[in-house]
Amino acid sequence: MSGIEQLAETVATDLEQRLPGQRKTQRDKLALLVATMLQVRSATLMDVAACLPRLAERLDSRYQWIKRFLANARVVSDAVMAPYGREVLARLSAQGQTVVLLIDQTKVSERHQVVMVAVRLGGRALPLAWRVKETQGAIGFAEQRAALEAAARLLPAGTKPVLMGDRFYGSPDLITWCSGQGWDWRLRLKQDLLVFEDGGATTLAACFRRGEHRLRDIELTEKRVRTNVAMVHEAGHPEPWIIALSQAPSVHTAFDYGLRWGIEAMFSDFKTRGFGLEDSQIRLAGRLDRLILIMALALFWAVSTGMWDAVHRPTPAEKNPAMADPGAMPDPSLPCSSGACGAFTPAFTA
């Protein structure tokens, strides 16, 4: 039995425990594709087919087998990801940590963009939910809301996360949605947005020029959405950060926005520095969605393996916190344990 087949068996066992209602054939195929993706690290289906351990079939038959799986509408990404996301969020909440959710968009093909909601963990991010859309520009609020609602369903009762997003997401609609959910937010704003305060109208850029860097309970845009705003401008940076936030505005709360960079590292894992998602040449949104699902599960396994290794076989830098990046250091209490197939483990099993 090859290493891919051994890992696929372990992934399939994990999927059976998490998704007992899913058809066994779907779980087994998904497990085999996740294991192969971890080996190949390529979104090119022919590369995946070349390593897929189905020796009785020709290469073109294996390629068609993958395409049929990606076309299977019964494989629903939200449903498959739910137990993984739910466990990570529950453990973060149980440890008393603030759950930091990140939202961002990236180009996944010449025709498609994906908006993704992720959770920050150990200085990086793990995907929770996403929506793929055929578009050349920004994905609208309807798809953002759908991905956020899918992620919200995974939160433990009583958990109040903070949502972070860049200037695509500093919108009145999203601020209103967060407020309605009882979430906190740190959302970067465009400088030309209108501000209404004390009966007058101005822009955020004008406020910044006047030295008004902390605005409390202002009304934003013609929709008159209420929020606080904090502005900071570090030396050497071309533009200030203008951050809408739910809590009292301060330099400290504005710099919280920097936590969102974890999702950029995650997108690199999906794309140029990892699986090469943008090279898939897939033309249909549903198939791209399920390819992202395969990569997302592979990423959960890879990250949990790395975190387990850092705890149990630390490098000198990991042994000495003064030498390491504190934001990237794993917590020994995180649910990473040794398992079959070398160090690969079901992501965040107890």
Tell where the protein language model's regions lie, with residue ranges.
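Short hydrophobic beta-strand that contains or immediately precedes a catalytic carboxylate
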Residues: 102-103
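Residues within the helices of the helix-turn-helix
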Residues: 46
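Single, function-defining residue in the core of a domain
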Residues: 1-42, 50, 80-82, 94-99, ...
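Short, basic alpha-helical nucleic acid-contact segments in DNA-binding proteins
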Residues: 69-84, 88
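Short active-site-adjacent helix-start/loop capping segments
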Residues: 57-59, 77, 109-112
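Short, basic interhelical loop/turn and adjoining N-cap
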Residues: 52-65
